[in-house]
């Protein structure tokens, strides 16, 4: 192997610090880095505004009412371009396919019979959709309630039709639109129907997905070709766009799933993924919610122990795991322990930094008062904290990538170690500036002449760290392709 093709894994701390300082002096923070994600966080209000734009566009193009345009969009997957093309090719065909009939309006007699119950009602108590069949208020209310309460939301477009029977077994094909729902449905039913429209809009957009965290009511709109698939919402929770699990870049979904299957388990109560106990015991405790359960069968540990005399849990998985560990060679075992220790420690450090974010918000409020700065001008402090969290997350998963490298990929292993050490040094420098250099300004009673210099330094350190972090992600995602060696094949990893 050519020694010049591999960067040594032993990193001198002083050299790294000099590297960071030199980068700051040379203005490397302005260098172009890898492409970042362009993800937009959308609240329900934002989504409804986008829906309204599409509804208005279709309404203008087809000369349909907004309620009819909404019906058209919900039936045809909210694809405005496709609807316009189909409408131009044959409007009547499109109308028939979604149940928008084009018939003469009924006469305005004072009395008329309901087409559903057959009873006579004043004209003002009757209403019809595009078919013209008059239906009384009671029948509309009952019909809408039955469909929305009994049928799956995915089938509402199939069942929300005029209730009049036009034959022995056929019902009227005319669809019920939003205007009829708004007039006759209960408050709860209106809410459910509007939520259905909201969900169908997001579910039919290729670049849009709901945030997977429980309780989140926002969606993420990801611009095409925006780099790796790790995105976050306004709650600063990152997830993978492709598999909707916790963010795991720079490793792919398959590798992350394999590692998590063997080394982490979701808490049955709060769903947070918990790393495996380092002593390999089955008794797991979720610290956020204090739930105690079995690693393998997910049974509540306390309930399972009733009548057994304490922590006596018999689980066949324990024997299987011990057998698997026994089959590992000593070198494989050492590689695993080293990887798991670094993966777990970076996960814990990341969680610690996340827990520290509210403190940064408090500090920003304090500095806004003492340094006479707007809160928006102090967001560089929060950005530094968030960058540290992101670096810890990426470091965590680079160790998983390293574990699955083949044993003969020595060049990649050495380059990865060097890259990890450099990124850790960037994080340490940024963290030192954020925590140590920031502290004196918290106790100032009046604006400090040195605060602007601190702002410049922290901002540049954050930018420099971000650039290095993004290049680490890019390099690992590309399989450390910069390592060229005749002795190494181009395979993606070991034990795949």
Swiss-Prot record:
The keyword Acetylation does not apply. Zn(2+) 4 binds at residues 267, 270, 286, 289. Pathway: Protein modification; protein ubiquitination. A zinc finger (IBR-type) spans 191-253. Its EC number is 2.3.2.31. Zn(2+) 3 binds at residues 240, 243, 248, 253. It holds the Pfam family IBR_1. Keywords: Metal-binding, Repeat, Transferase, Ubl conjugation pathway, Zinc, Zinc-finger. Binds 4 Zn(2+) ions per subunit. Zn(2+) 1 binds at residues 114, 117, 136, 139. It catalyses: [E2 ubiquitin-conjugating enzyme]-S-ubiquitinyl-L-cysteine + [acceptor protein]-L-lysine = [E2 ubiquitin-conjugating enzyme]-L-cysteine + [acceptor protein]-N(6)-ubiquitinyl-L-lysine. A zinc finger (RING-type) spans 114-172, 267-297. One of its GO terms (molecular function) is ubiquitin-protein transferase activity. Residues 110-319 are annotated as: TRIAD supradomain. The keyword Metal-binding applies. Zn(2+) 2 binds at residues 131, 133, 162, 172. GO terms for biological process: cellular response to hypoxia; protein ubiquitination; response to UV-B. InterPro entries: E3_UB_ligase_RBR, IBR_dom, TRIAD_supradom, Znf_RING/FYVE/PHD. Its cofactor is Zn(2+). Preferentially expressed in roots. It is an enzyme of class 2 (transferase). Belongs to the RBR family. Ariadne subfamily. Might act as an E3 ubiquitin-protein ligase, or as part of E3 complex, which accepts ubiquitin from specific E2 ubiquitin-conjugating enzymes and then transfers it to substrates. Members of the RBR family are atypical E3 ligases. They interact with the E2 conjugating enzyme UBE2L3 and function like HECT-type E3 enzymes: they bind E2s via the first RING-type zinc finger, but require an obligate trans-thiolation step during the ubiquitin transfer, requiring a conserved active site Cys residue in the second RING-type zinc finger. The active site probably forms a thioester intermediate with ubiquitin taken from the active-site cysteine of the E2 before ultimately transferring it to a Lys residue on the substrate. This is Probable E3 ubiquitin-protein ligase ARI12. It comes from Arabidopsis thaliana. The lineage of its organism: Eukaryota, Viridiplantae, Streptophyta, Embryophyta, Tracheophyta. The gene is ARI12.
